[in-house]
Amino acid sequence: MLDFEAVLPAIGRQTVLCVGDLMLDEFVYGEVSRISPEAPAPVIAVQRSEINVGGAGNVARNIAALGARCIFVGLIGDDAAGRTLSAALAAEPLIEPVLVCDESRPTTRKVRFVSAHFSTHMLRADWEIAAPASLMVEQQLIDAILQQLPAADIVLLSDYAKGVLTARLIREVIDAARKLNKRVIVDPKSPNFALYRGATLLTPNRKEFAEATRSRADSQAEIAASAREAIAVADCEAILVTQSEQGMTLVPRDGEAIHVPAHPVKVRDVSGAGDTVAAVLAVMLAAGADWDVALRAANAGAAVAVSKNGTASVTLGELRRKVLPPASLAAEEKIVAAGGDLEPHLVEWRAEGLRIGFTNGCFDILHPGHVKVLTAARGACDRLIVGLNSDASVKRLKGESRPVQDERARAEVLAALEAVDLVVIFEEDTPLQLITRIVPSVLVKGGDYTREQVVGHEIVAAQGGEVVLVDILPGHSTTTLVARAQNGKA
């Protein structure tokens, strides 16, 4: 078995056969400020709406976002929602959709009305028929799955109890997969775990697990004991119980239970977090990870998913940044180009309660004075962002002969330092716009300045932050080094 970083290169070579209930997720965002005069009901002033591939389709999207290939088998109706889903899946380069159309039922569609300000779900409207698929449609699904099975490295059944995963279909797929020595992961909905007998791994949430095992599932000891009984019933290798803010517990048939606490994040939306967990587990196990590595990766994936709005997918880069400590990331992963997206980093760090620090400069030729400022800056915060003047900006500030090194080279040198968590290139002459975007808790500046002279001090102070001044080291400056080099005295 392989550790997390060793698994990553193999992910792109894996194919996951995902089968389950496909649905169209729509999120309508707005604000409620009044009650309808027609009835005692809130009126939502709609600001925007989003449409996403949901249910088992979101599992497929997560698999593809992680870089693996996904063959997806699902069911749609002969309607606009079905056509929207079919087109959306077909547009994903790593997803091969194999969709069966059932004209007798609508495509499952869920519309959620959400407070744009508080990210609170106010109402959900569903269009669905949850009855099992007809015998004819069931056979079409089974035939499609068995035809695709040889091409898969692992099978994932995503059960939302909307009619795709009938008892017969589950049985035929698991039996066929076992004959081909392919592992099967099941995200179950039925409380009868015997239905999934022979699967490799079941991934119920705590509510589903408690219902299936008729236990309270309110302690790790009880979860472990009940899981071992359930493993015998389901004849599976392991059961993973997800527990929202309390983390996850994996109970293998052989060996001790493993519990990992949830990452401390600001929860924006829990929709689809279970999909991410199932997808990460499938991809990691297919790529050669052991239970422990797959569990910790899935836990990290869930943390990223719930920090996003709507039905979210998680990329391999996001997963890697969550699993690995910042200091271990490659330099190029710590660089944001001018105008690039800072939000994922800021959201993640703030959700974890981390103090974000900021300093800036040209950093043309790194010298001990720079190192002193960067070290002091990192010591004053939990995560340090360095604003780096672009080549055009340096030229305007320092003259036509500068910079000596281009912005990419300067950024890579800074990003290689353990003290630096993120390098952000900016085009302006001052970092004011960047500071306005970041609103750091700590603003650090080296040199002979007063607090009032530091660009952006008022923005930081207004949010209760602090400005830290660091004395410069005498005799160290890039301008002096460049002049000495030009005069042959370097």
From Swiss-Prot:
UniProt feature coiled coil, ranges: none
TM annotation in the entry: none
Residue numbers spanned by region Cytidylyltransferase: 358-490
Gene Ontology terms for molecular function: ATP binding; heptose 7-phosphate kinase activity; heptose-1-phosphate adenylyltransferase activity; phosphotransferase activity, alcohol group as acceptor
Cellular component GO terms held in the UniProt record: cytosol
InterPro entries: Bifunc_HldE, Carboh/pur_kinase_PfkB_CS, Cyt_trans-like, PfkB_dom, RfaE_dom_I, RfaE_dom_II, Ribokinase-like, Rossmann-like_a/b/a_fold
Keywords: ATP-binding, Carbohydrate metabolism, Kinase, Multifunctional enzyme, Nucleotide-binding, Nucleotidyltransferase, Transferase
Active-site residues annotated for this sequence: 275
Xref: CDD domains: RfaE_like (cd01172)
Functional summary from the UniProt entry: Catalyzes the ADP transfer from ATP to D-glycero-beta-D-manno-heptose 1-phosphate, yielding ADP-D-glycero-beta-D-manno-heptose.
Protein name, UniProt field: Bifunctional protein HldE
Naturally occurring in which organism (per UniProt): Rhodopseudomonas palustris (strain BisB18)
